[in-house]
């Protein structure tokens, strides 16, 4: 039974990526075959490398935690884990005529089978690498106010991301380290394996696991990055928020993700945007909704009403006899349409406010108003209470 990856590195199951990388560096400095006298150093180093690769990849680590060590290794042999390429689907998958682990995934077919037999690095259904690997994408969150989403704004975000190691220039070893030809691949960077298949004996070329395809070994690794060529650093970047951005939308910053392998581009930084709620406006797509209080006389006689917008005050005509709850539309006073021309609308719902207290003169006037309309006034309740209870 092989050893659990967390135990290999000596970390807890809830260890952070930084803790895992630190444990990896400590183990590498002790068991790297080029610096260790331990006769089992090479085998231990492979285990350490494998444990680090699995536990520092978010998707693969999640699969590992869900499956457990033994089931994960079985799935990996079949090519069913996150970085292993195709799974059990397609021709030659689990239960297929060519046995487990050779499927190209759903939609694989004969091309994947012959690629597995005759070319490509790695096994278990994966495709061979055609060149340096692009850096992975990173994600971060950013919150903006509704006013900032209305006008557009430039904001700064700080992210922790891999950077090329400043001490070794990304090579993974010091400049003065001794160099020798890798004995496992004779300096070729690849090794050839002969396999017996249903089609006969075939040769498969794989990237050398000892030197990582470089064909050379170095007497020591960089103490700063543990031989990885990368360190995690904080980077402060400026994000341009376009007018009309909405919650849940994502902005892509090209080339601001993790660095790629030498000769390959960096990944991208994906910024997930959240727009804060506003105390005066409720957003509905590109439209805004606002509740506005008007007085009883304004509702009765009509008036020019001033309301706030995200671009300053605006006015509209309140019709005489307006009832509480009626809505008025102010065209073009809503949010800008993202990467399109024009704005949405502002919908103002009026709320007729009943005064909480009246002077004697105001009370007499309202009672006369009611009597003129033929309404009977309950002396005990009074017109004001009657009016207030009618809303």
UniProtKB/Swiss-Prot annotation:
What domain of life is recorded for the organism? Answer: Archaea
Q: How is this protein annotated for GO cellular component?
A: cytoplasm
Q: From start to end residue, where is composition biased (Basic and acidic residues)? A: 53-79
Q: Which residues bind Zn(2+) 2?
A: 182, 185, 208, 211
Cite the GO molecular-function annotations of the record: ATP binding; heat shock protein binding; unfolded protein binding; zinc ion binding
Q: What does this protein do?
A: Participates actively in the response to hyperosmotic and heat shock by preventing the aggregation of stress-denatured proteins and by disaggregating proteins, also in an autonomous, DnaK-independent fashion. Unfolded proteins bind initially to DnaJ; upon interaction with the DnaJ-bound protein, DnaK hydrolyzes its bound ATP, resulting in the formation of a stable complex. GrpE releases ADP from DnaK; ATP binding to DnaK triggers the release of the substrate protein, thus completing the reaction cycle.
What is the protein name given in its UniProt record? Chaperone protein DnaJ
Q: Which gene encodes it?
A: dnaJ
């Amino acid at each position: 039974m092989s050893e659990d990856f967390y135990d290999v590195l000596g970390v807890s199951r809830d260890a952070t990526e930084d803790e895992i990388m630190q444990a990896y560096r400590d183990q590498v400095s002790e068991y790297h075959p080029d610096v260790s006298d331990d006769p089992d150093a090479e085998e231990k180093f492979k285990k350490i490398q494998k444990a680090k690769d699995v536990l520092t990849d978010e998707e693969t680590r999640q699969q590992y935690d869900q499956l457990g060590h033994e089931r994960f290794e079985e799935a990996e042999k079949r090519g069913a884990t996150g970085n292993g390429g195709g799974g059990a689907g397609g021709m030659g998958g689990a239960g297929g005529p060519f046995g487990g682990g050779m499927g190209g995934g759903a939609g694989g077919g004969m091309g994947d089978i012959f690629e597995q037999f005759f070319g490509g690095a790695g096994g278990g259904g994966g495709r061979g690498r055609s060149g340096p690997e692009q850096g992975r994408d990173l994600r971060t969150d950013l919150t903006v106010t509704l006013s900032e989403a209305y006008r557009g704004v430039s904001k700064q975000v700080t992210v922790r991301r891999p950077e090329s190691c400043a001490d070794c220039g990304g090579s993974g070893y010091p400049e003065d380290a001794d160099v020798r030809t890798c004995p496992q691949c004779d300096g070729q960077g690849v090794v050839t394996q002969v396999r017996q298949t249903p089609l006969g004996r075939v040769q498969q070329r794989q990237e050398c696991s000892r030197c990582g395809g470089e064909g050379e070994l170095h007497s020591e690794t960089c103490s700063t990055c543990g031989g990885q060529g990368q360190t995690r650093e904080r980077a402060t970047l400026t994000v341009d928020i376009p007018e009309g951005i909405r919650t849940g939308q994502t902005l892509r910053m090209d080339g601001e993700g993790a660095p790629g392998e030498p000769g390959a581009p960096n990944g991208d930084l994906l910024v997930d945007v959240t727009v804060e709620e506003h105390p005066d406006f409720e957003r509905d797509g590109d439209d805004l909704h606002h509740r506005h209080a008007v007085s009883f006389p304004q509702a009765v006689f009509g008036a020019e009403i001033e309301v706030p917008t995200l671009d300053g005050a605006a006015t509209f005509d309140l019709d005489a006899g307006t009832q509480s709850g009626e809505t008025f539309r102010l065209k073009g006073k809503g949010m800008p349409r993202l990467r399109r021309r024009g704005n949405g609308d502002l919908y103002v719902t009026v709320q007729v406010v009943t005064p909480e207290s009246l002077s004697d003169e105001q009370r007499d006037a309202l009672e006369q108003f009611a009597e003129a309309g033929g309404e009977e006034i309950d002396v005990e309740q009074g017109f004001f209470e009657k009016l207030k209870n009618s809303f």
